[in-house]
């Protein structure tokens, strides 16, 4: 029976080659589209950190206009203002907590033949590395005092460390970023989160950052904004400080609790 139907298929293929090709292509396209949809759905629904996902919480506050909702009624913005993020860090009683912001800056590697490059930066607090199980290849995160003072400490990704230091243990060495010298305190091992859940506002499947800096440097170095910035009213005044005290949302905040 199988040979009979195989023969019929072969005769039909010879009789209508173009139609057979189109039908095969349509079936292949359908299978490809279905597999792509299944893969995306699997990645988006998978728990990226199952060992503690029930203890990690993303904080939202409603700072939006009293006259109109941010999006849907009773739905707060998906990010925070700088004022709210820093106040939460200072006053929240969580076991671990961190504010987050995305930025960018030029790193100038030392050595012949090494060109400056624009690095993806993540401004955060040192709790970030513990909360999200960041794997370290060398060193560790910066100290609590670096969070408080805005010490120019830096944690590099594995790829950035390879670009700047050829993959060597660079802890204790210096990196020039935005014209300032930073001390390397740690280098991450290969780390890929799919989805990159700690900041889905800028893309759940965006690439991981090249370097991580103390959050306070956002203010002291006046580092540029990146990602999504939304304001319900314009900042009062001019300059960088007026943005930080404005009602514009561009920051994230996470807490880890002892139990769910």
State where each predicted segment sits.
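Structured, solvent-exposed hinge/loop segments at the ends of secondary-structure elements
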Residues: 38-164, 168, 178
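Mid-to-C-terminal secondary-structure elements
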Residues: 126-142, 152-260
